[in-house]
């Protein structure tokens, strides 16, 4: 692998990215493949932090729309992200990558509490840091948690790994005329209501001028390509 273009990155994965083709739960082959690629990125000298969603286990928003109390549903979603975080930690440590999970909700038996300075020390020592339990507050998505943590640790970029190879004008699986955007501004994303991140997360990135790159995580080698500065997917940045 070449020299990393970005020295410190925050990789945001949806929970569904861990589910593979089965669509729910955690697919061992998928998580092992992602872990192997992360190992190569860290070996190149890049510092990598992770935020993983929980949608493969529980979707708080969907549950609240069916009548469940929104705060309770969101807390359940945060616990789902912790299950994914611990699974990813296990997959990484099995292949020799030092990994720490930091939780925004206290659960000292399984994870460190989130402490910004400690997280940054781990990264400086070449460890992968996984931020679990979102922001620790209901009504905030894991996208917003990813934006917040990226700012706090001084990341150069947020890499959002999805199942499509960028941002489209419509769902490419449903609409064959959907156009892929190679580049977008934050305002274009917000005005067009594009599914990059939710509005809160996008606004946070815009206010702090943090670029977002949306790319296809299902193709092996793409994380390395993005970290090395290769132009794949869609780049979202200021004017």
Swiss-Prot record:
This is Uridylate kinase. It catalyses: UMP + ATP = UDP + ADP. CDD domains: AAK_UMPK-PyrH-Ec. Its EC number is 2.7.4.22. Homohexamer. One of its GO terms (molecular function) is UMP kinase activity. ATP binds at residues 12-15, 55, 59, 162, 168, 171. Residues 20-25 are annotated as: Involved in allosteric activation by GTP. It is an enzyme of class 2 (transferase). The lineage of its organism: Bacteria, Pseudomonadati, Thermodesulfobacteriota, Desulfuromonadia, Geobacterales. Keywords: Allosteric enzyme, ATP-binding, Cytoplasm, Kinase, Nucleotide-binding, Pyrimidine biosynthesis, Transferase. Pathway: Pyrimidine metabolism; CTP biosynthesis via de novo pathway; UDP from UMP (UMPK route): step 1/1. GO terms for cellular component: cytosol. It is found in: Cytoplasm. GO terms for biological process: 'de novo' CTP biosynthetic process; UDP biosynthetic process. Catalyzes the reversible phosphorylation of UMP to UDP.
